[in-house]
């Protein structure tokens, strides 16, 4: 039999050398670690400032919270009202509702997302449970995009980019506006 010195013999020699120096368990362990790491990759935090508009994007440069947010306790229809520190949507105050109730013709979603907001009036921090009002067309007035304390989608209870209308009465999946009731003191 003639000795082959070509490509096949080099690959065979490499395979035999690798097999003699490494174990199957080590390979399977590394492969398992790679697969688990690949599966966990989507759970890493994501910087989503690039999808925001120009002025909003410029306001968030260098920080994930909105730069210059000064909470006030005078006008509940303003985006800077202290309860709206992490709201992303239309204020129900401007759409026929109140801070704690939906406008007529819309229904309250059973789901909520939470945030802690600072009230400059009494210098306390409160837990706010934002809830969407659903079932009517989007109000379109008093639209606020506040991202203070918002976390990526893998922590949905602290994310304000999700439309929380699933589970609303009568399959009312259309977002209308958002209320911001106080749950209690945060500290």
Curated annotation (Swiss-Prot):
Indicate yes or no for the key word Glycoprotein.
Answer: no
Q: Write down the species.
A: Methylophilus methylotrophus (Bacterium W3A1)
Function (record text): Methylamine dehydrogenase carries out the oxidation of methylamine. Electrons are passed from methylamine dehydrogenase to amicyanin.
Which InterPro entries does the annotation name?
Answer: Amine_DH_Ltc, MADH/AADH_L_sf, MADH/AADH_Ltc_C_dom, MeN_DH_Ltc
The annotated crosslink position for Tryptophan tryptophylquinone (Trp-Trp) is: 113-164
UniProt key word Electron transport: yes
Name the cofactor(s) required for activity, per the record.
Answer: tryptophan tryptophylquinone residue
What is the protein's given name? Answer: Methylamine dehydrogenase light chain
Pathway where this protein functions: One-carbon metabolism; methylamine degradation; formaldehyde from methylamine: step 1/1
Assembly, in brief, is: Heterotetramer of two light and two heavy chains.
Q: Which gene encodes it?
A: mauA
Q: Name one GO biological process term.
A: amine metabolic process
């Amino acid at each position: 039999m003639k000795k082959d010195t070509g490509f096949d013999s080099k690959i065979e020699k490499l395979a035999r050398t690798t097999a003699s120096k490494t174990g199957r368990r080590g390979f399977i362990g590394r492969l398992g670690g790679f697969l688990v790491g690949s599966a966990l990759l989507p759970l890493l935090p994501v910087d989503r400032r690039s999808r925001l508009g120009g002025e909003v994007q410029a306001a968030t440069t260098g920080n994930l919270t909105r730069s210059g947010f000064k909470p006030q306790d005078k006008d509940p229809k303003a985006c800077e009202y202290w309860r709206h520190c992490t709201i992303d949507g239309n204020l129900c105050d401007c759409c026929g509702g109140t801070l704690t109730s939906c406008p007529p013709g819309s229904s309250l979603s059973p789901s909520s997302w939470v945030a802690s907001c600072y009230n400059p009036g009494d210098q306390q921090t409160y837990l706010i449970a934002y809830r969407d009002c659903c079932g009517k067309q989007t109000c379109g007035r008093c639209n606020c995009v506040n991202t203070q304390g918002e976390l990526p989608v893998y922590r949905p209870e602290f994310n304000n980019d999700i439309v929380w209308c699933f589970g609303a009465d009568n399959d009312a999946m259309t977002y209308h506006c958002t209320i911001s009731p106080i749950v209690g003191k945060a500290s």
